[in-house]
């Protein structure tokens, strides 16, 4: 089978896109169409994957390159590149990631008689709503990030596509509530590959400083307001009074990083909160390995109530106990697997309680074992890879019939 996979950002790199492509190339020929904001070669063949990038212009043209690659269904550069790739490769199936280019994929798929599978890694309308909640109204947001328009696009897309991949049970339930036939929705969760829980050779660490009585918590991901990092910082201030060795290590970057750094300065927590910035994924994983507890403090918004962060399973796969907010998917998994503690979203006092409950090493080790076992038995990419391959076979077969 020949598959055209559409991804609206640069590649490399995205952990889910990489896992999906690595799995698909084991049995199929895969052509990935992606953005080219980093001005890479238009075509590249790597790890058995055909990578087709959008055209780009020189840096002297400023932000024109961003306009060329803007992921809108009517962008002629996307339409042409996707159309050309599908025609030349003679693709049998289109797999499109998230909503921005779903209509493009569906339109081309209908014209060429090719089935379209939609990978809904995000609740896109709710994610944009979270962005508005912090940034407020602006003309730009109204024109290109309008939740009402995006919800309309979503409702049409989920009805027209041949099959949908959902990342968690709560997302599947939401899609069914929108009128999607349950038979057209399959779970492919953001689980780690088996390599994640195999102990690799250590490289001497990546800069996490700790003392003999330290308790190190790690947050891995984008630095945005709805991810609850402010709550985590305020909780560290409370815990520090009883446990001076507590430390929060933050790995990542994002639009609200400056706000969080300012808060750390205002609370005089420079010795208790460490920002490592964006790290290569292998180095970020090593930071988790050097830490004691994994943290997922996301606000329980509609977005985080219907999606699941990769980092939860990364923490669990390496035997780290987790502290999560009461966003529905993370709360459900942590309670079912008994691999950590749940706190009330946006409640720094309750998060401080959860941190202190993991002060004992024996408690952390027991919860860490439960999380690791859950990944080994259920929440791993071997399981989800089988589901992914099955779905694409079904989609291709249904259109032929």
Model-derived regions, located:
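Donor nucleotide-sugar binding/catalytic pocket of nucleotide-sugar-dependent glycosyltransferases
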Residues: 34, 52-54, 125, 144-203, ...
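Nucleotide-activated donor-binding/catalytic signature segment of Leloir-type glycosyltransferases, i.e.
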Residues: 251, 258-286
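A short, well-ordered alpha-helix in the C-terminal region of glycosyltransferases
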Residues: 350, 363-378
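N-terminal subdomain of nucleotide-sugar transferases
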Residues: 1-52, 163, 169, 193, ...
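Conserved donor-binding/catalytic core segment of Leloir-type glycosyltransferases
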Residues: 4, 209-227, 232-236
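Membrane-proximal helix-turn-helix segments that form the acceptor-binding/catalytic region
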Residues: 77-87, 103, 107-111, 123-127, ...
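Short hydrophobic beta-strand element within catalytic cores of glycosyltransferases
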Residues: 293-296, 314-324
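Conserved acidic donor-binding segment of nucleotide-sugar-dependent glycosyltransferases
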Residues: 336-337, 341-348, 357-362
């Amino acid at each position: 089978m020949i598959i055209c996979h559409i991804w609206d950002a640069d590649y490399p790199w995205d952990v889910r896109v990489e896992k999906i492509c690595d799995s698909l190339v084991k049995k199929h020929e895969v052509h990935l169409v992606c953005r080219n904001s980093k001005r890479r070669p238009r075509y590249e063949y790597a790890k058995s994957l055909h990578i087709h990038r959008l055209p780009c212009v020189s840096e002297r043209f400023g932000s024109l390159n961003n306009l060329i690659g803007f992921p809108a269904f009517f962008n002629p550069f996307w339409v042409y590149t996707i159309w050309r790739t599908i025609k030349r490769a003679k693709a049998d199936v289109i797999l499109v990631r998230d909503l921005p280019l779903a209509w493009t994929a569906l339109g081309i798929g209908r014209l060429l008689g090719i089935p379209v599978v939609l990978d809904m890694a995000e609740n896109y309308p709710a994610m944009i709503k979270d962005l508005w909640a912090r940034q407020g109204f602006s003309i730009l947001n109204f024109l290109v990030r309008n939740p009402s328009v995006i919800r309309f696009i979503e409702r049409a897309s989920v009805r027209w596509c041949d099959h949908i991949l959902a990342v968690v049970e709560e997302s599947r339930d939401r899609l069914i509530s929108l009128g999607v036939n349950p038979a057209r929705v399959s779970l492919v969760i953001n689980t780690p590959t088996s390599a994640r829980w195999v102990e690799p050779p250590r490289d001497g660490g990546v800069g996490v400083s700790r003392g003999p009585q330290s308790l190190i918590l790690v947050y891995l991901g984008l630095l945005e307001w709805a991810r609850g990092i402010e709550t985590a910082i305020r909780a560290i201030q409370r815990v520090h009074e009883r446990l001076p060795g507590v430390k929060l290590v933050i790995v990542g970057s994002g639009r609200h990083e400056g706000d969080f750094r300012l808060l750390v300065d205002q609370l005089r927590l420079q010795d208790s909160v460490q920002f490592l910035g964006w790290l290569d994924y292998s180095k970020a994983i090593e930071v988790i390995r050097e830490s004691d507890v994994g943290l997922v403090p996301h606000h329980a918004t509609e977005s985080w109530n219907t999606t699941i962060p990769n980092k939860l399973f990364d923490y669990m796969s390496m035997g780290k106990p987790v502290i999560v907010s009461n966003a529905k998917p993370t709360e459900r998994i942590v309670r079912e697997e008994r691999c950590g503690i749940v706190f009330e979203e946006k409640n720094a006092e309750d998060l401080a309680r959860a941190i202190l409950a993991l002060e004992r090493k024996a408690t952390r080790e027991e919860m860490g074992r439960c999380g690791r076992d859950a990944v080994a038995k259920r929440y791993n990419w071997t399981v989800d890879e089988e589901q992914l391959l099955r779905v694409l076979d079904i989609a291709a077969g249904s259109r032929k019939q």
